[in-house]
Amino acid sequence: MRKSDYDKLPFVAVTDALHPCLAGWDKIAAELQRAISRGRLEKPILVVDCYPGVDELAVLHELTSRLTPKLVIHAAEAYHSPEKIDTLVKPFLESDNLVFGRFSSLSLVNFFDAEPLWRFRRIIDELKEGLVLIVG
């Protein structure tokens, strides 16, 4: 039997002394604010993508309280319902191979409801200035 190459404890070693890792919300927010200011955009859009299991609401709260965005969007508000997602993925899980199922032809957009996405886009387009924060 082949040994699994699944890494249960993945990590990335950071050795660049010019760009150290930041710990703590105050330091993270200050660095983000510096980057936003350098861009000199009237309507900067900051998107924070999260790994599964991350407390997105905590990230949203911490960044909102420190960056004071004009508009805050939690991407989960545009997801299809869990029932709809179950229906979407069910054909790919029904297989003779109970461990791996079948390869899926779905893409990320399949998991979102088009109406909230268009609503968010309209709201962003109508905003003339100020930071837009999207988390999720």
Give the ranges of each region predicted by the language model.
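Structural recognition of the conserved hydrophobic beta-strand(s) that form the central parallel beta-sheet
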Residues: 131-136
